């Protein structure tokens, strides 16, 4: 995809704009309840009360990581450039997915995003939440320390996941938010912790989700 080539796919997609302090996402209580930890592969049903807006925060020390999100169809691929959310294109689907600013919290570098499941187009079946390292600088996920993803719903329910510090990968699918329907039951939204990735960084992540790399 031309969008990715224009911003330097082999590394971190171009120079990072100036960072700002991370503000608390709209709709999330200032004093939120304790978050439930998730194990790799574990999934949970997201309560209806939390679906208006999900706050996503990734934090880590050590090497810098960039948060990226992909809006995926039922076959696990993007529909086009518009479904790739990163710091040069921080909004998708009319604001249903928005990448927020970088900041710091508790000694960790943080980056935020919001996902509004109810506002996503019907063709979007899942949102992949990933982090990628700067392969041009030779960094990988093994250099991340105290990495932590927190997802919190509009009503304050929260979940956390500690992704593995794997030196063999430089882009990782950390978690995904997805539609689920079992038989005749009503559709629900679920959150799954993943923690798997690609040794060739963002290029591998992109190819795995239908982005053509020349």
Q: Model-found features: residue ranges?
A:
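Intrinsic-disorder/low-complexity signal
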Residues: 1-214
């Amino acid at each position: 995809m031309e969008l990715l080539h224009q911003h330097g796919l082999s590394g971190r997609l171009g120079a990072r704009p100036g960072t700002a302090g991370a503000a608390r996402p709209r709709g999330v209580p200032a004093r939120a309840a304790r978050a439930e930890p998730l194990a790799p592969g574990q999934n949970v049903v997201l309560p209806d009360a939390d679906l208006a807006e999900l706050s996503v925060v990734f934090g880590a020390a050590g090497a810098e990581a960039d948060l990226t999100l992909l809006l995926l169809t039922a076959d696990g691929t993007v529909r086009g450039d518009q479904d790739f959310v990163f710091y040069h294109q921080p909004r998708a689907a009319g604001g249903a997915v928005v990448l927020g600013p970088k900041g710091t919290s508790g000694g960790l570098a943080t980056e935020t995003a919001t996902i509004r499941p109810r506002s996503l187009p019907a063709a979007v079946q899942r949102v992949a939440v990933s982090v990628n390292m700067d392969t041009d600088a030779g960094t990988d996920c093994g250099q991340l320390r105290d990495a932590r993803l927190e997802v919190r719903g509009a009503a304050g329910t929260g979940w956390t996941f500690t992704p593995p510090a794997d030196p063999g990968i430089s882009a990782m699918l950390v978690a995904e938010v997805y539609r689920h329907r079992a038989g005749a039951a009503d559709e629900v939204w679920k959150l799954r912790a993943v923690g798997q990735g690609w040794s060739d960084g963002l290029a591998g992540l992109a190819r795995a989700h239908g982005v053509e790399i020349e």
